[in-house]
Swiss-Prot record:
Belongs to the UPF0421 family. It is found in: Cell membrane. The keyword Transmembrane helix applies. It comes from Bacillus subtilis (strain 168). It is a multi-pass membrane protein. Disulfide bonds: none annotated. It comes from the Bacteria. The chain crosses the membrane at residues 20-40, 67-87, 103-123, 125-145. InterPro entries: ArAE_1. This is UPF0421 protein YgaE. GO terms for cellular component: plasma membrane. Keywords: Cell membrane, Membrane, Transmembrane, Transmembrane helix.
Length: 353
């Protein structure tokens, strides 16, 4: 199991909350530690956005718990009923992401009856808020996340895996069921990659120069993900049309294999440029135009010699996927060339997580 920064931040936040609660002299500091667990966030920007909601949820939970405690007295039944009401209110206010904090406050207030219930409720509410603030401080100060490095690493890793399967699929060297399972896994990885991209996008730059560079990087990374998704779409079609491709004209199969081989070679070179390992290679683009023309000519030629409409449709379908994949590669290379031309000092990229 890999220990990430968020795991360490959670531990630091719990420790800080417990120490601060003990130092101030708050009873039951354990509730500050519990609140710190639920309040930790994956990014600094998200911490700024959510802390107001967390404090608001804490206050709502405290008010409702105090009212029910004064009227009916603390009991397990009252804790359950109050929790249901608090959850309903959180959902109505569309701040369901703070339900856990509100419930911690409810339990902290109603778990025991003190002599002065109002003062008891106020102290417990303050204890939970202290846990929330401890997590906010840790998010702000300790171990700022490096989502750019993670984003690049995962983009390259996912793309390389997709290209590996395309090569095997073109040569009919794959087990249908195994490839199907791996395609589903790749879909999940691409969804997680989109989430990492959003976290990176949320990070804020505090200088005008770095803000401009980051905006260029965002466009570049977005296109790299789109291109990887087009490669995945091509793989899905190769897998779905595995038997149909086998019955296509032999010349078209050979031309399609050459075209996809070239696109994968081109994509590999772009990835190498993406991480700053090689220089641009103009001959690759010219060679790609030739393969594109050959694939189109082969399709038109074999379309005239083929009587079955289904084969024509499948040929057109797989060719359209290859053309779309190519267009995204062209756009990606244009963006990389532009970025490396105007921001040469920012081209050194860490690819290790």
């Amino acid at each position: 199991m890999k220990l990430g920064a968020r795991i360490f931040k959670t531990g630091i936040a719990i420790t800080l909350a417990l120490y601060l609660a003990s130092w101030i002299g708050l009873p039951a500091p354990i509730f500050a530690g519990i609140a710190a667990i639920f309040a930790i966030q994956p990014s600094i920007y998200r911490s700024f956005l959510i802390i107001i909601d967390q404090v608001q949820a804490n206050i709502i939970g405290a008010v409702i718990a105090t009212v029910f405690g004064l009227i009916f007295g603390p009991s397990p039944i009252m804790i359950g009923l109050t929790a249901v009401i608090v959850i309903t209110i959180m959902l109505k206010l569309k701040i369901e992401h703070t339900i856990s904090i509100a419930l911690v406050t409810v339990i902290a207030i109603l778990e025991s009856a003190g002599d002065d219930f109002l003062m008891f409720a106020l102290i417990r509410t303050s204890t939970v808020i202290l846990g929330v603030l401890s997590s906010f401080i840790v998010n702000l100060v300790f171990l700022p996340p490096k989502y750019e490095t993670k984003l690049i690493h995962n983009t390259v890793e996912n793309t390389e895996e997709i290209m590996k399967w395309i090569r095997l699929s073109m040569r009919q060297s794959t087990e249908h069921s195994i490839l199907k399972e791996d395609i589903e896994k790749l879909k999940e990885k691409m969804i997680k990659l989109d989430q990492t991209y959003l976290l990176y996008k949320e990070e804020r730059s505090y200088f005008k120069k770095t803000t401009y560079v980051k905006s260029r990087k965002l466009v570049l990374f977005r296109q790299a993900i789109i291109t990887a998704n087009r490669a995945l779409d091509t793989l899905k079609k190769l897998h779905r049309l595995e038997n149909e491709i086998y019955h296509m004209p032999e010349e078209f199969q050979e031309t399609l294999t050459e075209e996809l081989d070239y696109l994968l070679y081109w994509h590999e070179r772009i990835l190498m440029r993406f991480v700053g390992k090689i220089k641009p290679h103009d001959d690759a683009v010219e060679e790609g135009i030739r393969y594109k023309q050959l694939l189109t000519k082969s399709f038109l030629k074999n379309q005239q010699n083929t009587d079955e409409e289904l084969i024509d449709y499948n040929m057109l379908n797989i060719m359209a996927s290859a053309v779309e994949y190519r267009e995204q590669l062209e756009h990606l290379e244009t963006l990389i060339t532009s970025f490396q031309t105007y921001h040469p000092k920012d081209c050194e990229i860490e690819t290790e997580e």
